[in-house]
Amino acid sequence: MASMSSGDESLRLCMFDLRRGQTEGQELEKILFFYPADLDFSTQLSVIGLSEGLITFTRLFSPEAACEVIEAERHSHVFYEAEPDIWMVMVVEKNKETGAIWRIDALRRVLKEVHSLFVMFHGSIRALIEKEPTGGLTRSLLYPFITDYLSTFQIWSLSEDCCCEFFVGKKLQLPTFRETLRERGTVQMLTLARDTAVEVQSLVQVLDSCAGSLRCHSMILFQDLLVSTTLSADDTVDLFTFAVMRLTSKALSSDTSSWSYLRKGPGSSEISSRSNLAPVGSIDSLHSRNGNNMHHVIRPLQNDKWTKGKDGFLITDIWGLETGGSPDSAIPTIWLQQTQERMYLLAYQHKSLTLLLLMPTNAIVNGDLSISAVKQQVIEDASLRILKIEENISRGWGGENAYHIKGYRYLVVDNDTKVSRSSPSGKVTTLAKESLLALNKLREEVDSEKSRAKGQEKDMEICIRAKNNVWVIARVTRGKELYMALEKGSDTLLDTTDAVGRFSNRYCSGAFLMD
Amino acid sequence: MNSSAQAGVGSGALSHVYIHHPSLRCNIPESNGLFYDDANRLLICTTSSQVFSWETSPFNPDVPPSVDSISEGPILSIRFSLDKKAIAVQRSDCEIQLFNRETKQILNHKCKAGSESILGFFWSDSPLCDLAIVKTSGMDLFACDSMLNSLRLVETKKANVNWYIYTHETRLVLLASGLQCKTFNGFQLSTAGVVRLPRFEMTMARSESNSKPILSAGDLHLVTVYGRIYCLQVDREAMLLHLYRFYRDAVVQQGSLPIYSSKLSVNVVDNLLLVHQIDAKVVIIYDLFVDSRAPVSAPLPLLWRGYQVSETSSQAVNKEIESSESSTSNENIVMYEDGWTFLVPDLILDQTNKVLWKIHLDLEAISASSSDRTSLLEFLQRRKLEANKAKQLCLGIARAIILERRPATQVTQAIDVLVTAYSYSVKAGTYKEIKNENATASTPTPGASPDSERHRQSGSNIDEEVEMNLSSGSQENMFCADEQQESQLSSPAISPDELYKFVFTSVEEMMVEESEYLVAIITEFLRSISAEKLKVDLNIYVMTIKLLAYSKRFAELSLFTTNKIIEPSKEVAFQLLDSGRQNIRVRKLGLDMLRQLSLHHDYISSLVQDGYYLEALRYAQKHKVTSVRSSMFLEAAFASNDMQHLAAILRVLSELIPGFKETSEYYTFYGLLNDTSSSVAV
């Protein structure tokens, strides 16, 4: 399996700022994050120095989009420019025997995801650095955040891929070829019957008006599927990702069962201490410079911190205890990318239904709004509807394999809405390793074609018969992508395109026209 | 209902109930009696030898009376037979005379003088008998032959009778007996037969002096509201009006209303109970449909109006001509004067002036004085007499609450009321349609509503009060009214289309800036009609898209579309394309919808417009669409300056369209292709 002990060389993950530490002797300044954190500085600097060199060099030829990936003999270096001049680089060891076969874009999406989540909770890194030029604040936030994020990989892998269970607790699993039929950075939607959908939208209107004249945003999930959102596609993806990680009924219940393993690993208890071992200068001096707020570093991705309260609202002490200070200071807040607004986040849960409610923080500062009043309003106006909708959806819900389509192993991605749907993971595991590898390879090809197109919409249709007689298919058209593996050995190409055409007509409203 | 609303207005001109000029006037000289025949709805005026009768339904003051001659003699009461072929006149307490209007034959009926006396009589349409005569010893039921030559006694109901009441509307006769006259034997003589009611007693409070009050016939009122039969009993000691409801096998007291006058009378207009507090000269309106026994509106005087007011606001227009007290007019009306007789359901007979008034409700005034819009809408939706006015008021209220930006929950309730009422009337309407085929002539649909076509299909125009006949086997309401045939009513129900047309489109312009609020309301509206499984004009979806796009709520727009809350249609797809000019995702939704609807031509044209000419051509090839101008693809490809594409398109078109190679288009573009690049082979 694609796992590695955090101590060995198999994974390096760093974030650095090209605008910092440009004079000799101050190189350490540019490091914002490094994993593993206990690596000595010279090694850290050599990784970053190499990356920086490559970026500077490639920028000569392509100033807009510099280096994306470097394939060395034993390692792949994946680059991601998270913000202008703020780079994230992931170095992974290639190892065919352990199954460490990656798709670069899937790895880049990991970088993108952790960055997006960070920005959602703390705002952009550039803004943080500008606010506090020593970088100490940024580092003290990034270290626990990314480490928490990486630790969540173990939990995810446990629930999604049972093959990895043996390694949970010791290893990190990055997305390998086995996850080729899923797309990080997209949301998975629940398909609703029209009358339920109308009920849901009606509930959304109620939720949105829970703060009186002030319009709130909301997002509703059923299990790990999105039911509705009023946020932009990007904000939806980020909040959805977080909710599935930490807030949904599944996340709340699985935490308790698997967390015990993880405590043994690079768990939460160690992180805080390790972050204090962060490489730059003396943390203590930073603390004294920045006053009291540095003592409490908020770690939004910390696991096992959310519980369901009596009133149905989810409670956490990540943002502090409700008893201290103003009653609203302990309410989680996030930033919306689209509007650059800071919002309070309230989560309400009824059985499998999770509702997230977002209210602009400035409204509360102005005294226009009180959280407890909003909570009360939600309970009064919406709880009956929530009850009814949960019942309706549960009744119509086909379970884990609801979106399994017999004979097909597929992934459909809509890049415009950032929505994807795929065969249930339990069904994907029935595919032969060769099939998955072939599809992974095909996706890699499509990725590079897409990146060559530079944001323009590509139109592609590829059907390949792989060694084990599996048909792997990619179809890209006007922002929509379809990937598929058909393991029926005797099919001709004609049969295959027919099969894809039928799939497209039946399940994608004919979006993928096949020749 | 809010009563304080009028307290502020305070003007004597305010009223909820009124009578208006002209009245039906019986200016017959030397008349010596004025009677009302409730079975035939005739106002009867007698002279010593003549009988003048006016039809009161429909109420038309200009109609001339018909005249019959009868022999001279005292007239205690007079009633036309139900086929109007005969006139029965009670001459004394032991004699009734029947006059055949065609043959002029006279039939005398006398009872045993001394031992018993006749209290009254009435005609019946029950299969058993034609005429019932109530005597102190009981009730005799007679059958007449077709020529009215003889009366044949078919049955006698023995009972000691002090007095009785009967209304043809209820077909119910109550025979009072006992010392206090509060024990009743009841019979219903309906078309289904004669039904005997269980014997029952009415409640009477004891007076302070401990004397037992005696109930009189004037204290009882039989009324029909919503097809239910009630008997109202005045209890002067308790100052209460008791309500008894009649079921097939039981009489159940259902609450009491307070009274504020020792003299009291009732009318029923449009299923509303009007209680005239005669001493106080005010009317209180009750709606017995709801369980609450609270009045619909505050007590206000009965007004006299010079002429009918219709669409305009009653308070504003009629102040100068309204008069609550009297004598401003030539008619010399004194409100609630002693000579007034209140005739159920909705007539007032002024014995002094020999005029008949019809009572009207002022729905506008009632709705103006009510603050609870939801119950007001429910109230208005139950109105049938002035269905159109009720409907217009409902539409007005719906518009107003949206324009006033009432909280969405309030508006939701209001919409739910209207949609549920419509749905109910559709269901009830179909039921009645079936019934009409084998029963009475169906009521013509008057004043066809703007949407009459749709209404007729669903049969919603017919009034919702489905008559429950004895024969229909309904266990509950065995008694019921016979009003149906003459109810020329359309329902005030408002179809979703009308709500869209008269509410949403009219508020849309004024609320562009508050599109979020309006979207919330429309969502609730869609939820409401979806719950009732109704359909609505698809233009509401076009409106929804516009509003969502206007407020840039693209995430929701996308959800509305993909979840088919916005039902797919060509118009909707085009609106998406149009709104999608600001947002490519929305535009794609429109394109997807065109494709899903198999609108090949539009889909292909839109694809080419967006520059996806290859995809468009592929689609055209796949679906064998040849209706799209071939030059469109070629021009698009040429404009994109991709000669390879142009060549490919030329080749595909040659295969797709027979004879394409002979067209001038082919030559033009083939020439262009060769000019630009000779290296590309076709």
Curated annotation (Swiss-Prot), chain A:
One of its GO terms (cellular component) is Mon1-Ccz1 complex. One of its GO terms (biological process) is vesicle-mediated transport. Its main location: other. One of its GO terms (molecular function) is guanyl-nucleotide exchange factor activity. InterPro entries: Ccz1, CCZ1/INTU/HSP4_longin_1. It is found in: Endosome; Prevacuolar compartment. Keywords: Endosome, Guanine-nucleotide releasing factor. It holds the Pfam family Intu_longin_1. PANTHER family: VACUOLAR FUSION PROTEIN CCZ1 HOMOLOG A, VACUOLAR FUSION PROTEIN CCZ1 HOMOLOG-RELATED. Plays an important role in membrane trafficking through the secretory apparatus. In complex with MON1, acts as a guanine exchange factor (GEF) for RABG3F of the Rab7 protein family. Promotes the exchange of GDP to GTP, converting RABG3F from an inactive GDP-bound form into an active GTP-bound form. The RABG3F active form is involved in protein trafficking from prevacuolar compartments (PVCs) to vacuoles. May serve as a linker between Rab5 and Rab7 protein families in PVCs and mediate PVC maturation. Belongs to the CCZ1 family. Interacts with MON1. This is Vacuolar fusion protein CCZ1 homolog A. It comes from Arabidopsis thaliana (Mouse-ear cress). The lineage of its organism: Eukaryota, Viridiplantae, Streptophyta, Embryophyta, Tracheophyta. The gene is CCZ1A.
